[in-house]
């Protein structure tokens, strides 16, 4: 063995065990009769040996680099990681994200109070605003009265909260009757009946409404002002009505470039799902948008700066099945199907979170309390994707801002519940009504479960959004609502992905939106 090889062996051994040297290395550099050398002398000797080592580099040119073996051990190189080209998707000052959903977070949970406090708080919060709207709409000579001050046949204005009396509405009494063997009601798509009545309530008393008001177009929980008179039967004959005035949203200025957010809902994954291919097409279209032939779709998908999932990640039947088989999962080493579904969703979100921000809202089927406002899903349900800062678990409803654009949305429970109790023609019209009524979910807590708030009502819409959406709807619908004072609000019904295989792309510059189908490998815009 040459001297160089001996020296290299000594160097390698030294850097593997700093401050020590092997017996063979010591004998190679000193006589056997030499005493044991101190550590400092060994370090000095090895440094001299490194300097004396012959260089394999040619004489001319810059000084030779340190030997590879020593350099590798001293400063090991970290493995390189492939990074997706996401520079164009990074939010700018024009698209900075602000979460405004703090009012939906439950910090102190107390379920020992009555739900009447929520209605009283809603009426108390909106009374002055609705009264002002009534004064602006009608002649100020018409008196605004409390119900106990009404004089029969004298025209006046009343302000109160609406209650819809429905004979077919589900109730706990009917549930108990069903459990005791009484006949069930036939399945219904709606609980509307010709005998339904509208009743206006306030702190003093209540009064039945009739006249120019369509019972089937209203639901419980709406604060409104009505103009009319009381007849000889004690029924208030309505001549006109109004709601709170919409606040004027911030004026939007044009952006330099078009930026988009992608809205999706209703994956409904389970062990029998058949949409895994479509979800894979969705991920591939987002991560490899440069391969898309359509320039229009390529421009949209390459400029997605946010992906919002409006609930219902898993199928509802899984939860029912697991409830009956709970003992089996506790006693045997078996995995619930919903766990496998959540694992698949986590892998999906992990890929998307690598290229853009993703906002996850819970839905009625998801592992979160069904009562509104639903709290954020726990990050432990997404062990991979939750490690990325671009993954955000949020509430339902979800209120947020991107740049100057205010967006407000739900996972669809509010729209579904209103559809059950009215004959409103389409879902986007329900969204428009909620906007005019000034309440996200007016039927909370009558027929839609919610937390029993006492001192505030978080469902009141104090600030008019620029975009108002609802997830898990039967089909894609959109409308540009135009109100007084040049107010414009984009209303969006997001289709259920498991049924439509499509998402909605919203242009933040123009507030226009497109339904994009991912039914096959080539995404298409549905006209």
Stretches found by the model and what they are:
Residues 2-527:
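Extended recognition/assembly regions associated with phosphoester-bond processing machinery
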């Amino acid at each position: 063995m040459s001297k160089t090889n001996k020296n290299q062996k000594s160097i390698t051994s030294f850097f593997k065990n700093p401050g020590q040297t092997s017996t063979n290395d010591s004998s190679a550099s000193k006589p056997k009769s030499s005493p044991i050398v101190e550590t400092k002398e060994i370090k000095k000797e090895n440094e001299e040996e490194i300097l004396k080592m012959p260089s394999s580099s040619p004489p001319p040119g810059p000084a030779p680099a340190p030997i590879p073996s020593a350099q590798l051990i001293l400063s090991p190189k970290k493995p390189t990681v492939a990074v997706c080209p996401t520079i164009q998707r990074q939010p700018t000052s024009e698209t900075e994200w602000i979460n405004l959903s703090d009012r939906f977070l439950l910090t102190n949970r107390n379920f020992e109070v009555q739900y009447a406090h929520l209605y009283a708080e809603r009426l108390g919060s909106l009374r002055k605003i609705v009264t002002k709207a009534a004064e602006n709409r009608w002649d100020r000579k018409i008196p605004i009265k409390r119900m106990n001050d009404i004089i029969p046949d004298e025209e006046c204005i009343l302000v109160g909260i609406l209650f819809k009396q429905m004979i077919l509405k589900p109730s706990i009494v009917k549930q108990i009757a069903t459990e005791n063997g009484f006949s069930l009601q036939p399945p219904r798509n709606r609980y509307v009946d010709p005998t339904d009545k509208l009743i206006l309530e306030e702190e003093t008393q209540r009064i039945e409404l009739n006249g120019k008001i369509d019972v089937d177009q209203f639901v419980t929980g709406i604060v409104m002002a009505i103009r009319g008179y009381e007849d000889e039967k004690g029924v208030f004959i309505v001549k006109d009505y109004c709601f709170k005035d919409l606040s004027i949203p911030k004026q939007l200025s044009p952006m330099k470039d078009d930026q988009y957010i992608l809205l999706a809902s209703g994956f409904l994954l389970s062990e029998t799902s058949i949409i895994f291919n479509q979800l894979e097409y969705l991920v591939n279209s987002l991560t490899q948008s440069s391969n898309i032939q359509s320039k229009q779709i390529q421009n949209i998908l390459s400029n997605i700066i946010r992906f919002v999932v409006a609930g219902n990640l898993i199928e509802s039947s899984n939860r029912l099945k697991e409830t009956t088989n709970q003992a089996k999962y506790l006693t045997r080493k078996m995995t619930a199907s919903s766990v496998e579904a959540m694992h698949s969703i986590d892998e999906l979100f992990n890929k998307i979170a690598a290229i853009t921000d993703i906002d996850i809202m819970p839905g009625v089927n998801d592992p979160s309390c069904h009562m509104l406002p639903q709290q954020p899903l726990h990050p432990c349900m997404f062990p991979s994707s939750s490690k990325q800062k671009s993954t955000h678990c949020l509430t339902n409803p979800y209120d947020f801002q991107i740049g100057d654009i205010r967006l407000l949305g739900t996972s669809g429970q509010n729209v579904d519940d209103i559809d059950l109790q009215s004959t409103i023609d389409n879902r986007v019209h329900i969204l428009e009504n909620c906007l005019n009524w000034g309440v996200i979910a007016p039927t909370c807590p009558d027929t839609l479960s919610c937390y029993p708030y006492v001192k505030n009502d978080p469902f009141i819409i104090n600030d008019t959004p620029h975009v108002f959406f609802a997830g898990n709807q039967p089909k894609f619908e959109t409308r540009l609502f135009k109100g007084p004072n040049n107010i414009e609000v984009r209303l969006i019904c997001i289709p259920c992905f498991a049924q439509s295989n499509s998402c909605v792309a919203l242009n933040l510059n123009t507030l226009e939106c497109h339904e994009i189908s991912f039914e096959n490998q080539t995404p298409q815009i549905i006209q």
